Amino acid sequence: MNLKRMIIALACSALLLVPFTSISTHAQEIDIHQQSIPSKLPVIGDPLPKVNQDKVTTPLHPFSPSNIKNSNSFFHTLAATRTVTILIAADEEYRAAHPDWKSLTKQLVEKAGQSFLTEHNIQFSVVNYTTWKSDGYDSASILYDLNTEWGNTSSYDFVIGFTKDTRFTAGGIAYMYPSAPPSGISVIFDLGTLYTPYAIQHEISHNYGLPHDASGSGIKCMMNYDYAYSVKYWDASHDALLESHRNWYGY
């Protein structure tokens, strides 16, 4: 990735560890200062409470189609299917926690991809796996680690890193690009089988250039932190933006 030619905003889901009882509860707002990672690219800090990892492993059944479709969306009826390729990367902590990490992460990604397929005919295809070492001191610098290794590749549309590094204090973090990059880069924390697919769909949406909805706005959308762990679709404005960017990736 040529950093001199591209201004990249980092949209980070700083899902801080706080007591969590209901996914419908409005996110607690915490003010933090803008910070920077080694690349000197700006990090937009917009925190969201991190849900505690589900104690019981939730079966990875598909999302119910009735819970994905937004009645205000019509894009799924118009667009031809577009397939995007995905490389899954797992760091040392994630691999240690999940010996079956390849099959697990594939299922998590495919579940997250249902919303993209149902609403926008974007088909997620996991085509390869790799390992990586998360050396960063916080969430943003760990994302930078992954980007350093894979940000310039054009072999995959998306590179999704999975981490269980204790220095990663977010539930997910991703680069939000102003135009099509060589590859979309994101890192997802291990939130368990229940909540991880929500984090993936949120961060991949950032890779497509989608910003957040304002907390407290009442807008039901996966890009609104108030509904990030309960909603599997986009609001009308994000639907339109995603549709306009769908050709950034895939074939």
What are these regions (language model features)?
Residues R5-F20:
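Sec-dependent N-terminal signal peptides
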Residues I30-Y156, T163-T166:
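Propeptide-to-catalytic entry region of secreted or membrane-anchored zinc metalloproteases
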Residues M1-L3:
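N-terminal secretory signal peptides that target proteins for export/translocation
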